[in-house]
Design a protein with these regions (language model features):
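Conserved hydrophobic/aromatic pocket- or pore-lining residues that grip, position, or stack substrates
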Residues: 39, 63, 274
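Amphipathic alpha-helical segments enriched in hydrophobic/aromatic residues interleaved with Lys/Arg
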Residues: 2-7
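Basic/polar phosphate-binding segments, predominantly the helix-turn-helix DNA-binding elements
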Residues: 8-23, 46-82, 102-124
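A solvent-exposed interaction/effector surface
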Residues: 66-69, 77-78, 85, 89-92, ...
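A short, Lys/Arg-enriched amphipathic alpha-helix from helix-turn-helix/homeodomain DNA-binding modules
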Residues: 17-47, 80-96
């Protein structure tokens, strides 16, 4: 039901295909990447199958099967999962009303939204918000990543001292990205970084460009095998995309940023503080855009024993 209400059965539908694998012909991945980007930007409104097929430049008759083969989900289940995950983020991090969240996520009424949310997460939107965004159903919890396992035992005062937050304004940037699925298998992400670095080196844009990662998915609610991460490179110098890559445009935006140096546990703790410690006590709310992990030491971006990063959360003033 792409052009209407969310299908609350998305969890079952997600099992109707094998886990997604990169197609041998990269043009298939590029076209489906365009569809995913289009869907993420239009979750607030009905989107017809014909529209998505046109974005992908595939026959409407075959598009549904191609999408399922590449993504591991039906178009319906994928779209409705994105809507529910966006709703979960808004419930956790914004003060919007349930009605406003329902409309922002493509539901025609708060009652319809509440039914779909309960079917997806086994809790009501109100209960989810009151619990601080905790999913209590043990079956669902097994499917998602638990960031708490990675957090360092630091007091609130220690976090404030260790992770000072600054506001920065970044201009529009253009470049390329490689989208990786099932990113909790770290080798997949590292291979994508290696591919990106080798490519931009060959195009002579590596020294002056920016290497970063981002994800529009939420590890608190997205099943691990469906979690997507984009390995990105932007440059003021033009360069063409490699065969596994798609074009990227990051709009100008304000970010709350933390500079972090350390292992993956320190990175996870810094992200947790930025959102749960700083954001909810600030005069800002998150923009509907992914956070960035900018690699300050590009030469060693594939060495994941130690990170030098700017963690950047897109924000705007609370209204």
């Amino acid at each position: 039901m792409i052009d209407g209400e969310a299908d609350s059965r998305w969890q079952m539908h997600a099992l109707s295909f094998e886990d997604p694998k990169a197609p041998a012909n990269p043009e298939y991945a590029r076209r489906i990447d365009r569809v995913i980007d289009h869907l993420r930007g239009n979750l607030h409104r009905p989107v017809k199958l014909a529209e998505l097929a046109q974005v992908a430049c595939f026959s409407e008759f075959h598009f549904h099967r191609i999408f399922g083969a590449v993504c591991g989900e039906t178009v319906n289940s994928f779209t409705n999962r994105l809507r529910l995950e966006k709703a979960a983020r808004l419930l956790r991090y914004s003060g919007q009303s349930l009605t406003d969240i329902a409309l922002a996520c493509g539901f025609s009424a708060s009652a319809t939204f509440s039914r779909a949310f309960r079917a997806g997460f086994d809790t009501s939107p109100s209960e989810f918000r009151k619990s601080g965004g905790e999913i209590k159903n043990s079956k669902i919890r097994k499917e998602i990543f638990d960031p708490q396992e990675y957090l360092l035992p630091m007091s609130a005062e220690d976090k404030r001292a260790a992770f000072p937050v600054r506001l920065i304004d970044l201009p529009e940037r253009r470049g390329a990205y490689i989208r990786v699925t099932n990113t909790f298998e770290q080798s997949r992400v590292i291979d994508a970084f290696r591919t990106m670095i080798e490519w931009v080196r060959s195009r002579n844009v590596f020294p002056e460009g920016t290497l970063f990662g981002m994800s529009a998915d939420d590890p608190h609610v997205t099943p691990k095998h469906l979690y997507r991460y984009e390995v990105c490179f932007t440059s003021s110098l033009p360069f063409e995309c490699g065969e596994r890559m798609s074009n990227l445009r990051v709009p100008a935006m304000r970010y709350a940023a933390i500079r972090v140096s350390g292992d993956i546990r320190r990175v996870a703790t810094a992200w947790d503080y930025l959102i749960r410690g700083w954001l909810i006590n600030s005069d800002y709310e998150p923009e509907p855009a992914p956070g960035l992990e900018i690699f300050l030491d590009k030469e060693h971006a594939t060495d994941w024993s130690h990170f030098e990063l700017d963690l950047c959360l897109p924000v705007r003033k609370l209204t």
